Structure formats: C-alpha cells, structure tokens
Amino acid sequence: SDATTEGNKKMVRKHPFAYCVCTAGDSIGLTIENLNDTIALNASLQALGITEVSASYSLIMPESYVGLPFMDVDPKEREVRKKSKSAQELSVICEEIFDRKEGVNRLVKGPIPWFFTKVVGGFFEKVLITDKRFHVEKDKCVKCGICANVCPVGDIKGGHGEYPEWLHHKDCLTCFTCYHHCPHHAIEFGRQTQKKGQYFYK
C-alpha cells in the first residue's frame, strides 16, 4: 500500500549510511581500518548509529607525493590512463552510493598493507609530515599568493607583494598542494623536489 511504501521510505532515511571514497597514487594500506577505529571512538557518530563505514572504495589517481628521492609524479601517459580508469570507476561508485549499497569494499590495499600503514606511515608522521623543509626560491617567486590561497590548513602567509612564509603551526599536512600549484615552480621541499614534476587535478 501507499502507506507501507511511505513508511519504508522513512525507515530508509533514518538508517545511517556512511561511506568512504579515498584516493591514492598506488595503494591505501589500512586506511579504512584506521577510519573505522576512529569512528568507534567518536561519541557523536555512535549516537547517530554509525559504528563503521557501510561501504568503502579506493580510486588510484596520479602520483603527487614528491618528498622522497625515489618518488615523483607519474609520466603523462600513466597520468591520463589513471584518470580515465578512475572516472569510469567513479561513475559506478556514485550509483552504488546513491542506492546505499552496503558491504561493498573495493579497495587497493597493496601487497603488505600493515607494513606501509604502521611502519612506513608511522615514519611519515614522525619525520616527514612537516612544513620545516618547505622554502621558496626567491629568484623564481612572483609573490602571487597562490600557494597561500590553496593551502588547505592555512599554514602559509604571503602573496600580494610578499614572499610566502610557512607558519610552523604543526598543521601542515605535507600534501604538497603549494608545491604543485606554484606556476613558476618556485617552491621546494629541501632538496628532494629539485627537477621533479608537478601535478594537480584539472
């Protein structure tokens, strides 16, 4: 009946559906496990009936981490290939999320997910996630302020006639957004980024 249908719709709306779509250059390790652990400690989410994600996905996108000697952006051909494949996968993901499809876990965790999350990830958190190595090549910088504008945590001030300055508030994610968006390649991360490429999604 119409009344039953309407009642079912209300029940569906009340049932929480949490999902996660994460991106990576090659693999995500134990990202979803860590997320679920965080959700389990969040009283506000627990009160809403959310104890873990109902569906999880990973999209392999072009490499953007350039903070180590052996890491650089992908060649153009690989970049295009990854973006094309991810666009197709994203269409399917959107449909499944719209339909609130539960129990889906299409993830690229990598060959040794615990090692890259716990050991390598731990090293990154302690040593490599910092703004202290960022600096500007003043002979290239035009003081446009793009780096300050795109920083997701507001860790950079500058532009409008001033050189960029990292604020060392310990908020830096070392996401390299400032590096990749600089139109004159004037931002470096120690010596690790010299002669390396830039990438951001267009």
Model features per residue range: what roles?
Residues 199-202:
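Active-site-proximal loop/hinge segments that shape catalytic or ion-binding/gating pockets
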Residues 136, 142, 146-167, 171, ...:
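Iron-sulfur cluster-binding cysteine motifs and their immediate structural context
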Residues 1, 176:
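Rossmann-like NAD(P)-binding element
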Residues 22-25, 140, 171-172:
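Short loop or secondary-structure boundary microenvironments that flank
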Residues 2-123:
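FMN-binding flavodoxin-like domain, especially the glycine-rich phosphate-binding loop
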Residues 111-145, 149:
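A mid-sequence, solvent-exposed acidic-amphipathic segment
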Residues 19-21, 122, 131-133, 163-164:
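A short, structure-level motif marking secondary-structure boundaries and short turns
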